Amino acid sequence: MFVDQVKINVKAGNGGNGMVAFRREKFVPNGGPAGGDGGRGGNVVFVVDEGLRTLMDFRYQRKFKAKSGGNGAIKSMTGRGAEDTIIKVPQGTTIMDAETDQVIGDLVAPDDSVIVAHGGRGGRGNIHFASPKNPAPEIAENGEPGEEREIRLELKVLADVGLVGFPSVGKSTLLSTVTSAKPKIAEYHFTTLVPNLGMVRLPDGRDFVMADLPGLIEGAANGVGLGFQFLRHVERTRVILHLIDMSGLEGRTPYDDFEKINQELQTYDPDILKRPQIVVANKMDMPDSAENLAQFKEDLKQDTLLAQTPEIFAVSALTHDGLTPLLQRTADMLAETPQFPVKQPEVATTAEYNFQPEAEFTLNQDADGTWILGGDKLVKLFKMTDVNHEESLLRFARQMRGMGVDDSLREHGAKNGDLVKIDDFTFEYMA
């Protein structure tokens, strides 16, 4: 099964916890703190595997979690850093943040890799909190939480040449004739349901990858037929071979086919029409094809969608007539055409500053009167607080006070004994 789009969840490893420990050695009185730091959590890394062809494996595993770092130890020993979690994807995979659609990475080269979620840093041991006022602190940090995010993977086949056209115009027949690929061929529309790839090898030693893309119909960019689910694969191609059935047996005129397919490509992404395009006038072995081709050349003069009039090659994929000059010209055109970069989502280039600091925490009250504290910064500070040591809790209380949490609770009417909740931790408010 060919799978080219999937949504998954990734979670990097948490940092290891710092340790509260003291140096206990013979003849060393008052040895002082000796708790080590936690190790860094593992990253989640995507790498290219040239042996993969689809994203099918992700249908069965949608959550990936890296290991956490090791905890700090006595004698100021740092915990072991966790190994990265490596996720293999096919060449040509684009990785995007599912929430913002921001491109995280575009893995097109065999050795490409990208970190999609960073592991948390290790928490500090009590050796970092010693001071003249508190030479033996019982304070240590928990590890920083690792990043977690929803990401979307899109596979865009890496082909130099893309075959586009209405269903049953002969794309699969052409691919099977000029390559060793064996796509399904039958006398009905939408025989091809997934992209098929083949390698074209010319006698002069040149070669290129050709992709047979499922047939488009009018309205495909808006979801009609197979919709635009395979139009994304055209984005990777450098040259487009636009196959047109010159026989007219489908009841459509060749120029109408040409115009409608290009309109669909323009609706999906206007930049696709900037790619070199060759018109492949197929089925020239049929009775009325020569007459239809002559009319098509006349009609083509009125085309306004393409920047320049495309070259036309009359062929018969069935009898192999005309294929050699078509492939030679395609190879020449590839040599003249650079790679097209992945299209990034448009973002604002001008930032507006209103000089209002971002809120460090949020405060709400639920139905039973419990005060709920939230906010990324505050929750992160709490998760890095070792609640098993009183001094760590007192330090967290000072941090909240410095952020203005106490003042905010008081202003909102909190009273002594009210319950306050942060994440999964509940305590009583003391004014």
From Swiss-Prot:
Annotated segments matching region Disordered: 125-145
CDD domains named in the record: Obg (cd01898)
Cofactor(s) recorded in Swiss-Prot or TrEMBL: Mg(2+)
Catalytic activity, EC: 3.6.5.-
MF GO annotations: GTP binding; GTPase activity; magnesium ion binding
Domain OBG-type G: residue ranges: 159-335
Compartment(s) where it occurs, according to its Swiss-Prot or TrEMBL record: Cytoplasm
GO cellular component terms given for this protein: cytoplasm
Function: An essential GTPase which binds GTP, GDP and possibly (p)ppGpp with moderate affinity, with high nucleotide exchange rates and a fairly low GTP hydrolysis rate. Plays a role in control of the cell cycle, stress response, ribosome biogenesis and in those bacteria that undergo differentiation, in morphogenesis control.
Name of protein: GTPase Obg
Taxonomic placement: Bacteria, Bacillati, Bacillota, Bacilli, Lactobacillales
